[in-house]
Design a protein with these regions (language model features):
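Glycine-rich, proline-tolerant flexible connector loops at the mouths of alpha/beta enzymes
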Residues: 77-90
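Catalytic domains of carbohydrate-active enzymes, especially glycoside hydrolases
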Residues: 57-78, 287-292
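Active-site region of glycoside hydrolase catalytic domains
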Residues: 1-42, 66, 85-87, 95-446
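A common structural microfeature
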Residues: 6-8, 55, 72
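Active-site mouth loops of central-metabolism enzymes
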Residues: 43-57, 131-134
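Internal amphipathic alpha-helical repeat/solenoid segments
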Residues: 54-63, 84, 94
Length: 446
């Protein structure tokens, strides 16, 4: 088995998690700057004030990525750094920073993939309602159009939103991500609608400004895989099922809206609230991307119970898990990309996949992360099988470097590159070398 000849091998990062120095050169506050100052919100009181110092060390990191033979770098631009007040008065110094990042990628033979929203909402917009306010969607579209016009000809791949599901669930429902709210269902549906409108409006703004660019969205959500071949239909149906109790962390709540122009939950309060979405709003949301990014980490094993009712099978004692206690389930790569491709019929990219390990510097000065190599090997083997049934065109490891892992702070390490935070020294982990070989051989070594 092998991947397609033009398969994209890359790594990913985000602005707040890596850059640090958000106020440098006239940058504005984001909701994460404010959230991190609230006691008890982030492990160990950590924040993104320094992060990996990517603001000053981006050239080193891009150089390391290029040295690994990776062809693409997915990163986000901080809306707050470029548009401090969310009012369209652009901070030229912030824009010039991303000029340097993009030009550095191109100089190193690396294709930049630009994510326009990876949760860096200007705090000024949160104070006027954030994603509860439709005006935020319109302001984001203005930002996206400006960015596309500015980088047209240098950036050929734009992603509108990263994981709207997580913005909604962790930021506005559970309150464990910025802005730290706990809203009720009607308010959550309003936030969802504005996020989907933001995709639709920004998609059109990017298309108008950079007609040749490819535009995607990065989705996440529950993934189910069958216990046996006889359970595949049940696992597929459960992957796309929407209920009042289980709708925010699902792919169809985003992808059905943008790809199909409709969302059809089971009977309940959610269905009633969605019935108030106007035909014009559905039309705006319905902006079919050129590709779908899938952020894939783990899933659930499903069997068909009596009358086909899905049964979530318990994980056996000692089941493999990551340092974050996320289960290791490579089966999702074999099945769920086929499920997604069959439903949406669009090219797919793995825009995030990786794990947190208890990485440390060994006595020999190196970082030996055998768990990450094994994880990647298993997931890529399964993805090879998935490629037989789906149009999968690339894989971006999450993440390029260790970084600020949101409410977990710096306790979790996802990178191919180890960051010694006191010194900001970078060390290639063993997994980086393994992944580099995999990219060179286009996966033939898996």
């Amino acid at each position: 088995m092998a991947f397609r000849e033009d398969f994209v091998w890359g790594a990913a990062s985000s602005a707040y998690q890596t850059e640090g120095f958000p106020a440098a050169d006239g940058g504005g506050e984001s909701i994460w700057d404010v959230f991190c100052r609230r006691p008890g919100t982030v492990a160990n009181g950590d924040d993104g004030s320094a992060a990996c110092d990517g603001y000053h060390r981006f050239a080193e990191d891009i150089g390391l990525l290029a040295s690994l033979g990776l062809s693409a770098y997915r990163f986000s631009t901080s809306w707050a750094r470029i548009d401090p007040n969310g009012d369209g008065r652009w901070n030229e110094a912030g824009l010039q920073y991303y000029d340097r990042v993009v030009d550095c990628c191109l100089a190193n033979g690396v294709t930049p993939w630009m994510t326009l929203y990876h949760w860096e909402l200007p705090q000024a917009l949160e104070e006027t309602g954030g994603w509860q306010d439709r005006g935020t969607a319109e302001r984001f579209a203005r930002f996206a159009g400006m960015m596309a016009a500015h980088f047209s000809g240098r950036v050929s791949h734009f992603i509108t939103l990263n994981e709207p599901q997580i913005v909604l669930k962790l930021g506005y429902a559970d309150g464990i991500h910025a802005p730290g709210k706990r809203l009720l269902l009607p308010e959550l549906v309003s936030c969802w609608k504005n996020l989907m409108l933001a995709h639709g409006l920004s998609f059109r703004a990017i298309r108008n400004a950079a007609p040749e660019a490819l535009i995607g969205i990065a989705s996440t959500g529950k993934l189910c895989y069958p216990h046996s071949p006889a359970d595949e239909t049940t696992a597929r149906q459960e992957t796309f099922r929407l209920t009042d109790a289980d709708w925010m962390f699902t792919h169809p709540i985003v992808l059905d809206a943008v790809c199909l122009g409709r969302v059809e939950p089971e009977p309940g309060a959610l269905r009633g609230l969605l019935s108030a979405v106007t035909p014009a709003e559905w039309d705006t949301m319905h902006a079919v991307p050129d590709f779908i990014g899938v952020n894939s980490y783990n899933g659930s094993e499903i069997a068909a119970g009596p009358d086909g009712v899905p049964v979530y099978l318990p994980r056996p004692q000692g089941f493999a898990c990551t340092a974050l206690k996320w289960p290791v389930t490579p089966e999702i790569m074999a099945y769920d990309f086929a499920f997604l491709f069959d439903r949406y019929r669009l090219p797919l990219y793995v825009t995030e996949c990786g794990l947190s390990c208890n990485d440390h510097i060994f006595l020999d000065g190196q970082v030996h992360d055998a768990d990450r190599i094994d994880f990647l090997h298993r997931y890529l083997l399964a993805l090879c099988r998935g490629c037989e049934r789906a149009d999968v065109r690339g894989f971006f490891h999450w993440s390029l470097t260790d970084n600020f892992e949101w409410h977990s702070g710096y306790a979790e390490r996802f990178g191919l590159i180890y960051v010694d935070y006191p010194t900001q020294k970078r060390i290639l982990k063993d997994s980086a070398r393994w992944y580099a070989q995999t990219a060179r051989e286009n996966g033939k070594n898996v």
